[in-house]
A protein has these predicted regions:
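Positively charged n-region of N-terminal signal peptides that target proteins for export
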Residues: 1-5
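N-terminal soluble domains immediately following signal/targeting peptides that reside
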Residues: 36-181
Length: 181
């Protein structure tokens, strides 16, 4: 897991300067505009870092996108939906198909979402995927399957650090693939 921590640190350091610049650049432009912050229903983020034979991904989403609610499950039906979500997110195939190379999940960590909700009751789920790929240079496409599984998800903001450089893009129900190379 040291490699995963390294990759997260690398990703954050590469993007910190652009975030600080963007914040400074638009500080005066904020008056009169409403900003949504990190918790927007219908939207999730996927950070992806590829280094050597490793592919690390971090998915963050409001629970509303995956469950249809953000509170602790109360009814038997809600408890069942919640357990199904945990099992689905712990399977790589729920997130994506990797085309061009064989990748194996070394570690998938789904964080308990109800330990960190804000005062307004907004709750996010965080999932970290750490993969080992046989021939990562042959990866041609990542097909994101989340939209097929979770109908409340409308947009996936993707930030990637690849050997070829950094890239940001938005995926939605019509555009579900990330071309690599």
């Amino acid at each position: 897991m040291r490699v995963a921590a390294y990759l997260v640190t690398l990703f954050c350091s590469l993007n910190l300067s652009s975030i600080v610049y963007a914040q400074d650049k638009h500080q005066d432009h904020d008056a009169g505009h409403r900003h949504h912050g990190a918790h927007v229903h219908g939207m999730a983020t996927l950070d992806l870092v590829m280094d050597d034979h490793h592919l690390m991904m971090h998915l963050k989403s409001p629970l509303m996108n995956f469950l249809g609610f953000e509170h602790q499950p109360e009814t038997e039906q809600q408890k069942s939906i919640y357990q199904d979500m945990l099992q689905q997110l712990a399977m790589l195939a729920t997130l994506m198909e990797i085309k061009g190379s064989s990748c194996k999940a070394e570690s998938i960590e789904v964080e308990e979402p109800f330990t960190d909700s804000d005062e307004a009751g907004h709750t996010d789920v965080d999932v970290s995927y750490f993969l080992s790929c046989e021939e990562p240079e042959n990866i041609t496409e990542l097909k994101i399957n989340l939209f097929d599984v979770y109908s409340n998800l409308e947009t996936l903001q993707v930030q990637m650090v690849l050997p070829s450089g950094q890239q940001q893009l938005k995926l939605n129900q019509q555009r579900t693939s990330i071309r690599i190379q």
